[in-house]
Amino acid sequence: EYGPSVAMPRILDLLDDYGIKASFFVPGFIAETHIKLIEDLVSRGHEIGHHGYMHEPPATLNKEEEAEVLDRGTAILKKITGNVPAGYRSPSWELSNNSLQLLHDRGFEYDSSLMGNDIPYIVNAGSGSIVEVPVHWELDDHPFFNYSPYLGQTNVAASPRHVFEIWSAAFEGLYNYRRSF
C-alpha cells in the first residue's frame, strides 16, 4: 500500500509543482483496486496506459490468453477513465510473437516495451505498424531497488544518490544528443 497511498500522492504533487504531465502504465487489477487514484491521475491530466491485468508477461501466454488480458485490461481502464488507453507497456517489457499484431488490431497508438532506439520509431505489427516509444532498463527503478525474497531477488538496494547519478548522466547524454529520456 505504500506506493498508492504514500508515494503516488508525493509524486503527483511534485509533477503538479513543475507542471509536468506523465504517462502511468497501470495493470487492470491495480486500477480496479485503486479506482480513486486512477481518477485522480486522470483529473490531473496524466495519461493512463495499459500494463496487463495481473502483470502477466505476454511471452508466457498463448495468443488467445494474451488477447483476453488485453481486452480485460482495456475494458477496466475505459470504465474507470472513460477512455480506451492509447499506449501499452508490457509487463516485464517483453512481448510475445503476437503482441504487436494484437495491439495494432485493437487500435493502440503506441507500444513502450522495446529498446531498439532512443527516440520513437515505427515497428512492424504484422498487417500494419505501430509507434514504439522505447524504454531502457537503466531508467527503471526495478533493477536498483527490487527486493523480493519469494522470487529469489534479494539484492541489496542501491543508494538513491547512486541511482540519481546514473539517471542524471543518462539524461545529460540523451539531452546532448537530442534524444528521448
What is each residue range found by the language model?
Residues E1-G87, S92-D140, R161-F181:
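Catalytic alpha-helical scaffold of carbohydrate-active enzymes acting on polysaccharides/glycoconjugates
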